[in-house]
Amino acid sequence: MASHKLVLDDLMEDLSFSLIGIHCNLEDYKLAYLINKALDINLKRNENDLTFKNGASYSFFEWENEKELKHWSLVSNIYKQEIKITESKGSLFSNEITTRTIPLIPEYRKVNYFLKICDEIQSINETKILNTIYNIPQVVTAYMINHEQLTSKGNLIF
């Protein structure tokens, strides 16, 4: 009996999507609200965050536009994990809490959020969307990212 293997690179080639990196200091719900208002879309918080085996969990908003065959996803790139470190100093123990940041896409660790737009009929105007997001006053910068060159593109399958 023949076996069929799916290769991640083959799967990613079949996907047609645009990826926008967004830098801002806003909470996830506030950015989703401002993007909804600016682009006239309806991103809603998913019941389940995007969670990985290493314990990292990223906030996740999505909206399916069935009329235009587009799927919008806003995902946080930053997960902060508090780690308790116990150090021995003589006969006393010192407990110290440090924060470790785990990015969803390590190649873009400075990006706060990613907006992923899956478009089945490839009718999206990337420039218009990018300019609209860039013109949100609380957004520091936003730019297109070539997802084909990412080594961690498997993290974008959701």
Positions of the model-derived regions?
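Aromatic- and glycine-enriched beta-alpha-beta binding-site module
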Residues: C24-A56, E62-N65
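Glycine-rich, aromatic-bearing surface loops/beta-hairpins
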Residues: K110-F158
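Short, flexible, solvent-exposed loop/turn segments with mixed acidic/basic and small polar residues
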Residues: K5-E13, T99-K110
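Terminal, regulation- and interaction-focused segments at domain boundaries
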Residues: D9-E27
